Regions:
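Transmembrane alpha-helices of multi-pass inner-membrane enzymes
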Residues: 49, 258-263, 447-459, 463-480
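Alpha-helical transmembrane segments of multi-pass inner-membrane proteins
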Residues: 9, 78-84, 123-160, 164-168, ...
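N-terminal signal-anchor transmembrane segment
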Residues: 1-57, 81-86, 253
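A juxtamembrane structural motif centered on a specific transmembrane helix
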Residues: 1-9, 199-204, 227, 278-287, ...
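Hydrophobic transmembrane alpha-helices and their immediate junctions
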Residues: 108, 206, 396, 418-454
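Aromatic-anchored transmembrane helix interface
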Residues: 70-76, 90-112, 124-133, 156
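Long extracytoplasmic/lumenal interhelical loops at the membrane interface
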Residues: 353-419
């Protein structure tokens, strides 16, 4: 059993690295009118991890133990599986249900064997966690450079809508399918880094946020402690700058919401240490502003250096215009001296977009509205939905989308449309159970704020295979 326990730990160690490969490399197994059949590294990890969990549970005779205590948790996945029977896309429904059960088994395994997460495990896990995050940040920067110098997309792995041709500067997607997924993948490491910085110097037992990176024998004023604090700030700058470079409104908005809740929560719970906590909060917001300014300058510089006719100022203007939904507008008539001596821009290409892309927002709102329209069309659909995996087919059949592959780009509307009022009600019950469980953990502030950030981000997309980290990472971070 010791070998299995060790293997279990190794699987959890590599999970943060595995989830970053959410789309590339991908194993393409086939295609149909309504979906692509693909296998990614996170899915392979999930299957192998579940096989290990089953073996461990069988050896310890835990597979069906405490079933009476877990039955409420199973109501939601059972209902989703039943809804496949009337799904308008049976194959997609079956595959989606399979992934959901794999996730449930993985999370149950993490909970069942949580005693393996000792202090040494937490220390090693954070090394893997932040190490993988820094590597992916470097990959994103490299991706931008490769795109600017004209390296083909099949080598840079940047998506078609992410190249400099769109806005005049590239926005990286790493090994994910789109920048919004890359930005979403950075939410967890960024918020964990924030949590460690704010809680690092709390001293009273009541308010202290335990920092797994701290070692015995070193006080808050020691040289090693100060070095760790500096490295923590540099880590946060790298993560935040990359997050802003993804140019993903959904991920950036989600981060800001999660950060606001975390800061407010930790200040509220600080008690007598509130003054110290407020200083750390101020430091974090200073780092956020610095990182945003750094990313903004990098995007402006990339616009100046790109083959398009964009300038530093037009690049900055486009970023601010897009992130503020067209509210902030900067006129690009006057010359800018910041980078005029760096390079003479002789680009003749014209970028596709001049700023805020209303079509992106309109498409999301249109699909969400179409989903709600179908859901409310009759009592049966309102109560039971069109079946798991059937949202795209339902939109197409009702002439509300151009192809059955089109999906509702809002996870909540998608769940409502596919599983009906019953499914949403069971989801709410599951969330309540999860929150009650998380509130008993030391890292409750971190995990709940991360879940809030993920909840906000799910308003901008839907789908399981490219976002397994949303469900797996909180299950492990709960035990930091």
């Amino acid at each position: 059993m010791k070998k299995l326990n060790k293997l279990f730990k190794y699987f959890v160690y590599v999970m943060p690295a595995a989830v970053f490969f959410s789309y590339e490399p991908v194993m393409r197994l086939g295609v149909s009118e309504s979906m692509n059949f693909e296998l990614s590294i996170p899915l392979i990890w999930l299957v192998l991890f579940d096989l290990l969990v089953i073996v461990m549970m069988v050896k310890k005779k835990l597979l069906l133990r405490d079933f009476k205590k877990k039955w409420v948790w199973l109501l939601f996945p059972v209902w989703l599986s039943l809804s496949v029977l009337w799904s308008m896309n049976f194959i997609r429904g079956i595959l989606t249900a399979g992934i959901i059960w794999l996730l449930y088994l993985a999370i149950d395994g993490i909970w069942t064997f949580r005693k393996l997460f000792d202090k040494e495990f937490k220390r090693v896990f954070l090394k893997w966690f932040f190490g993988a995050s820094l590597v992916i940040c470097a990959v994103c920067i490299l991706q931008c450079v490769l795109d600017l110098v004209g390296v083909a997309r099949e080598y840079s792995l940047i998506c078609q809508g992410c190249t400099y041709a769109m806005f005049g500067f590239p926005h990286p997607d790493g090994f994910s399918i789109e920048p919004q997924f890359m930005g979403n993948l950075l939410l967890a490491p960024t918020l964990v880094a924030v949590w460690l910085i704010i809680g690092n110097h709390n001293s009273t037992p009541r308010t202290r946020v335990q920092n797994p990176c701290r070692h015995r024998g070193f006080g808050a004023n020691s040289r090693l402690a100060r070095l760790r604090n500096v490295l923590g700030v540099l880590l946060l700058i790298a993560l935040l700058t990359t997050l802003f470079l993804t140019f993903s409104r959904g991920a950036i908005y989600a981060f800001v919401v999660g950060l606001l809740v975390m800061c407010g929560w930790m200040v509220f719970e600080a008690g007598k240490e509130r003054k110290n906590v407020l200083k750390r909060v101020g430091l974090v917001w200073g780092v956020v502003i610095l990182s945003f300014g750094l990313a903004l300058n990098i995007q402006g510089l990339m616009a100046e250096l790109s083959p398009t006719d964009d300038t530093y100022k037009s690049g900055v203007a486009k970023v601010l215009n897009q992130l503020t939904l067209g509210v902030v507008k900067i006129d690009d008539n006057s010359p800018v001296d910041v980078v005029e001596n760096i390079v003479e821009n002789s680009g003749t290409e014209k970028a596709v977009f001049d700023g805020y892309v209303e079509e992106s927002t309109d498409t999301r709102l249109r699909l969400a509205g179409a989903g709600l329209k179908i859901w409310s069309s009759d009592y049966a659909t309102a109560a039971f939905g069109v079946g798991l995996g059937g949202a795209g087919e339902a939109l197409y059949v009702n002439n509300l989308s151009p192809a059955p592959k089109e999906i509702v780009q809002n996870q909540y509307v998608s769940i409502l449309l596919e599983t009906g009022f019953v499914g949403v009600s069971l989801l709410i019950v599951t969330i309540i159970l999860a929150v009650k469980l998380i509130l008993k953990q030391k890292s409750r502030t971190l995990v709940l704020c991360l879940m809030i950030a993920y909840a906000v981000s799910l308003c901008f997309f839907s789908g399981l295979p490219n976002a397994l980290h949303i469900y797996l990472l909180p299950a492990v971070l709960m035990f930091l």
